[in-house]
């Protein structure tokens, strides 16, 4: 579980600025309305809005301090939107008042509403969006969007992807080494050795006819039918356009994996698309 670190909050200019402005606006609203309450009763809904906004402020500070915005971003958007609605309803009775303390409290709530709008836009955008990527570029501890060809996790000694032909999956299918006696390695059915001896015809091993079909089936290896593992993408990956076997995926996308023994994993997306993916871009769940 991610832990709260003050360095994440202080080292992120956006987080530090928005949380600081929100806390300052909250203090202005509470102090001003407390003063106004001594002269005139303040609606109870205002105190509920102030208490709710404090919870939103603390929640956003914890999320940014623990660097878990990619996990709780959707929840923050919902809570900030609800806080924006509460603040907007409270503003009317404060800004239109002739009392200075109430107007000051209204100014504080306006700042809170503006902060909520900024948070809704930030947390509601994906990390691949231009504005958010630009904002996150000022925070060194945040992950940046990666491209497969420009990313550092891939080393130059990365092994090639596995072959998907019959010869690699079954290296002895067309070899006569495992056989003995007068047996033939030809996968053709209906071959009669006695008839071949009388006609003088001999099977040619490794011929085009032998490798083309096996009982009417093509020589390509079928896709796996079971995907017992689930993996999460820790980086975005763009498939090589020259290789139809690779698949593209985005950061934090969940994939189903059939085998985790090699450097390239056979994966299946939620859309049903299948292909191979680099294992160091994924983490098992």
From Swiss-Prot:
**Which UniProt keyword terms apply here?**
Cell membrane, Membrane, SH3 domain, Stress response, Transmembrane, Transmembrane helix
SUPFAM superfamilies per the record? SH3-domain
Ranges that cross the membrane: 13-33, 45-65, 71-91, 104-124
Key word Acyltransferase present: no
Q: Where is this region: Disordered?
A: 141-170
Localisation per UniProt entry: Cell membrane
Protein's name according to its UniProt entry: High osmolarity signaling protein SHO1
- Family stated for the protein in its record: Belongs to the SHO1 family.
Question: Mind telling me which CDD domains this protein's record contains?
Answer: SH3_Sho1p
Supply the Pfam families for this chain. SH3_1
| Residue intervals annotated with topology Extracellular | 34-44, 92-103
Name the Gene3D superfamilies for this protein.
SH3 Domains
What SMART domains does UniProt report for this protein, alphabetically? SH3
Q: Cytoplasmic side: which ranges?
A: 1-12, 66-70, 125-285
| PROSITE patterns named among the record's database cross-references | SH3
Residue limits of the SH3 domain?
226-285
Protein topology in the membrane: Multi-pass membrane protein
Biased composition range(s): Polar residues: 147-168
Asked if Transmembrane is a keyword of the record, the answer is: yes
Q: Provide the function of this protein.
A: Plasma membrane osmosensor that activates the high osmolarity glycerol (HOG) MAPK signaling pathway in response to high osmolarity.
